[in-house]
C-alpha cells in the first residue's frame, strides 16, 4: 500500500492577527499518484485538520501522462469543493503550459486540465497573486513561474531578485506574503524578494538525503543543495521545502501560522 507522511510546522509572525492562527495544507510533487481510490485517504487526512486553504507548490502531474492529469484534476476538484485552493505550476506543468497544442498533444490536454480546474474554483497563479482574509489576517499568495532554463541540468543560471520582481511585482506591504515557488534552488533570492513564507518542492528530498535538511545531490545534479528538504529561516522569514512524492511516499505539509505575541 502506498503511504504518505504528514509533517506539521508552526510558524510565528506578527502579521498574524488572530490568536487561533491560520492553517494551510501544502502539497507538492504528487505527480498523479493516488493514495486509496481517488485519493480518498489523502483527502480524509486533510479533512481531519480542517485547513483554511490548500496551497499547491507544483508538479501535481507528470508531463506527457494523461492519466496523471486525470488523477490530479479529480483530487483538486474535490479539494476545491471544500477549501480555497491556490496552485502554482512546477516544471512538469510549465513545460506543457508553454507548449504549442498543435505540436504536442499533451499540451492541449493540459489546457483542458487548467480550464476544468478554474471552473471548479481552483486559483491557478501564473506569475500572479491572490488576496484572502482569514479572520483579521490579510494574506497574499503569490505563484512564481520561472523559465525552464532555470531547471536545466547540471548548470542553470542564477535567478536575480529583480527578475522575480519583474515576474510578480513587489510583496504586499499590508499582508502576510506567501510565495509558492516550485524550485527551492533559488531560496536566497526568494528571501531577498521579501516573502514571509516560501513553499517549494521539486527536489524530492534529494537523490540521496543525508539528514533532515541536507541532500547529497539534487535532481538537477547540484551537489549538496542548500535548500533540500525541511524548514529554513532568515530572521522572521521562513521557507518550507516538501520532499514530495518519492518511492511510494507522499509528503504533505500542514502549516500552522501563529501570531508573534
Q: What feature does the model see in each segment?
A:
Residues 178, 183-260:
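Conserved beta-sheet core of the metallophosphoesterase superfamily
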